[in-house]
Regions:
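Small/polar-rich, solvent-exposed N-terminal microdomains that initiate assembly or binding
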Residues: 1-75, 99, 111-118, 161-166
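Conserved acidic
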Residues: 29, 96, 140
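Acidic-leaning, charged glycine-interspersed low-complexity segments
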Residues: 47, 108-166
Length: 166
């Protein structure tokens, strides 16, 4: 574990002034695909960088995996998984927030090619639920949410002979 901590850069926790070691890179194929979608969203130049998990204090964007199920399992055990990704936003200006979430959905669903990695590939992104207001905080920040459906093809690498017992 100390090797991992030594090899990562320090990350400042928002609003704390302290730094914590960055977490090790994900090896989950689903998480790698979600991180790729987050990179696509950040490339749009929104009012904030998207984070994973709950929204923090102040204007921001976040995402997290919502309940999803495997859609298809093939004879070779590869799977097609439509992952619902909940996008949440908070901003004092409702128009900026609404425009941002709508732009994310409009742009990502119109791409014709997506990112892939070792053992996974995003094959499509579609709209789940369109952006909608879910509330307004006491500090006058509007809260909105929407869902993207990230369609992932997970392909396992061929097992070697020692794994097959041959």
């Amino acid at each position: 574990m100390s090797e991992i901590l030594e090899s990562t850069e320090n990350v400042q926790e928002p609003g704390t002034g302290t730094t914590d070691p960055a977490p090790p890179a994900s090896t989950s194929k689903i998480n790698l695909a979600v991180e790729a979608v987050m990179d696509m969203i950040d490339a749009l130049g929104n009012f904030a960088t998207i984070t994973r998990g709950a929204l923090g204090i102040g204007n921001g964007l976040s995402c997290e995996i919502a309940p999803s199920v495997v859609d298809s399992v093939f004879m070779d055990k590869n799977t097609y998984i439509p992952v619902t990704l909940a996008l949440n936003g908070k901003h004092t200006d409702l128009q900026i927030l609404s425009d941002t979430l709508n732009n994310i959905m409009d742009t990502l669903t119109r791409y014709t090619s997506y990112t892939s990695g070792n053992g996974w590939e995003i094959v499509d992104i579609t709209n789940g639920n369109l952006p909608r207001v879910i509330g307004r905080e006491d500090n006058n920040q509007w809260l909105m949410t929407c869902d993207l459906v990230v369609k992932i093809y997970r392909k396992d690498e061929e097992p070697n002979e020692s794994e097959l017992g041959e």
